[in-house]
A protein has these predicted regions:
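Flexible, active-site-adjacent loop/turn segments at secondary-structure boundaries
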Residues: 22, 28-29, 113-117
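N-terminal intrinsically disordered, cationic/polar leader segments
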Residues: 87, 105, 109-117, 122, ...
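Histidine- and acidic-residue-rich, metal-dependent catalytic cores
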Residues: 6-9, 31-70, 118-127
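Histidine/acidic-rich helix-loop-helix segments that form or flank divalent-metal centers
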Residues: 15-26, 46-107
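Short active-site segment of divalent metal-dependent hydrolases/proteases
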Residues: 7, 11-12, 93
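Short, small-residue-biased leader/transition segments that mark boundaries at the very start
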Residues: 2-3
Length: 128
């Protein structure tokens, strides 16, 4: 559970090809990083003698639910406090990264950056 933050995107290592291509692999296209990561963690857990089944299920649930909503690609909605916290953190990270990229691309004299679908807002630079 506490390690879910470390492993929630591990499937991206097999979802995407190496740089410089960094393109989707066949499994990336067909399964996606959430399913791939859940399988990778499950395979590793099976090699650890005595690993608690309940902990394994909770860790895999956190990975499966880390996008938070079905419409965002999560096969499961968060059912554990840790899964909900991870989903909030992952969503916040994605939105802050989007905002950072928008600000980097904006000209010095640009105030309004336009509507962003992920942020669901017309974005403006702050003066604070």
């Amino acid at each position: 559970r506490r390690s879910s933050d470390l492993f929630h995107d591990v499937g991206k290592t097999k979802e995407l090809s190496a740089f410089p291509e960094n393109d989707y692999t066949d499994d990336g296209q067909l399964l996606g990083h959430i399913i791939i990561g859940t399988e990778m963690v499950g395979e590793r857990i099976r090699t650890i003698a005595g690993f608690p089944e309940k902990t394994a299920s909770e860790l895999k649930h956190c990975i499966l639910a880390h996008h938070g909503e079905l419409e965002y690609g999560s096969p499961k909605k968060p059912a554990l406090m840790e899964a909900l916290a991870l989903a909030f953190a992952d969503n916040t990270d994605a939105k802050l990264e989007t905002m950072t990229e928008l600000l980097k691309k904006a000209g010095d004299n640009t105030q309004w950056l336009g509507f962003n679908r992920l942020l669901e807002s017309n974005v403006r630079k702050t003066t604070v």
